[in-house]
From Swiss-Prot:
Pathway: Amino-acid biosynthesis; L-threonine biosynthesis; L-threonine from L-aspartate: step 4/5. This is Homoserine kinase. Its main location: cytoplasm. Belongs to the GHMP kinase family. Homoserine kinase subfamily. GO terms for biological process: threonine biosynthetic process. PANTHER family: HOMOSERINE KINASE, HOMOSERINE/4-DIPHOSPHOCYTIDYL-2-C-METHYL-D-ERYTHRITOL KINASE. It comes from the Bacteria. The keyword Transmembrane helix does not apply. Its EC number is 2.7.1.39.
């Protein structure tokens, strides 16, 4: 039996729409991500478990884990009879890479089960393809950090899909999921087809400056450059209370904040544990909208997807 855990991820990070993403893990040791188990069987089966299993499609063929198995078999040119189990711990449409968690865990578990016939680059390409079936287009800003860990910059040149960018150990990521759903497709549809020149220039300056600040080890500058002129001005209308929450966490002491992925999760970066706790407390009281919401204080997950059992 192979059991694989794939961590949550925060895509875009305000400054890098579709080209930056970070894998995250709670500081309290909780597993914030999906788990997929694969074991040999006479025929294929899929069992859904976990807190958010009831949110998955009732038709098995619509389940992305089934589609991962089907695509993996196609890639190898043979049917692979296995019993799969998806432990769905991630809320769907949360902005935390929920579909990426399932895709990464499923494909990595299948690859491990079969003796690693696919290398990481090919596996990541498949992950992007499968995740794109849910989000509506292929982009790697969730699957790459989820699979490889850390903060990843999408390259997509010279057969390189992404490369790691050095993060800052002192940064704590406070992630607040309010408990409502925002579909990636809906969040993309709300964006304009064209942007003003000054916005394009500002976006390029922010992103280039952020990457430079990461490599030159300037955390204050990096945090200051985490600004979003591409998506946030349009998407914030989908997120009740987002603008007030951003203002509040800044007043408490967060060094940066924004929309995680396409929302509705809000991320706030803090450089001190006590600030992170106060931000988390405020968000827990004021940003969550129902019992399904949660707040986690996280660090970068540098390990990425990993085998828990084999």
């Amino acid at each position: 039996m192979v059991k694989v855990y794939a961590p949550a991820s925060s895509a875009n990070m305000s400054v890098g729409f579709d080209v930056l993403g970070a894998a995250v893990t709670p500081v309290d040791g909780a597993l914030l991500g999906d788990v997929v188990t694969v074991e040999a069987a006479e025929t294929f089966s899929l069992n859904n478990l976990g807190r958010f299993a009831d949110k998955l499609p009732s038709e098995p063929r619509e389940n992305i884990v089934y589609q991962c198995w089907e695509r993996f078999c196609q890639e190898l040119g043979k049917q692979i009879p296995v019993a799969m189990a998806l432990e769905k711990n991630m809320p769907i449409g949360s902005g935390l890479g929920s579909s990426a968690c399932s895709v990464v865990a499923a494909l990595m578990a299948m690859n491990e089960h079969c003796g690693k016939p696919l290398n990481d680059t090919r596996l990541l390409a498949l992950m992007g393809e499968l995740e794109g079936r849910i989000s509506g287009s292929i982009h790697y800003d969730n699957v790459a950090p989820c699979f490889l860990g850390g903060m990843q910059l999408m390259i997509e040149e010279n057969d390189i899909i992404s490369q790691q960018v050095p993060g800052f150990d002192e940064w704590l990521w406070v992630l607040a999921y309010p408990g409502i759903k925002v579909s990636t497709a809906e969040a993309r549809a709300i964006l304009p087809a064209q942007y003003r020149r000054q916005d394009c220039i500002a976006h390029g300056r922010h992103l280039a400056g952020f990457i430079h600040a990461c490599y030159s080890r300037q955390p204050e500058l990096a945090a200051k450059l985490m600004k979003d002129v591409i998506a946030e001005p349009y998407r914030e209308r989908l997120l009740p209370g987002f603008r007030q929450a951003r203002q509040a966490v800044a007043e408490i002491g967060a060094v940066a904040s924004g929309i995680s992925g396409s929302g509705p999760t809000l991320f706030a970066l803090c450089d001190k544990p006590d600030t992170a706790q106060r931000v988390a407390d405020w968000l827990g009281k004021n940003y969550l909208q129902n019992q399904e919401g949660f707040v986690h204080i996280c660090r970068l997950d540098t390990a990425g997807a990993r085998v828990l059992e084999n």
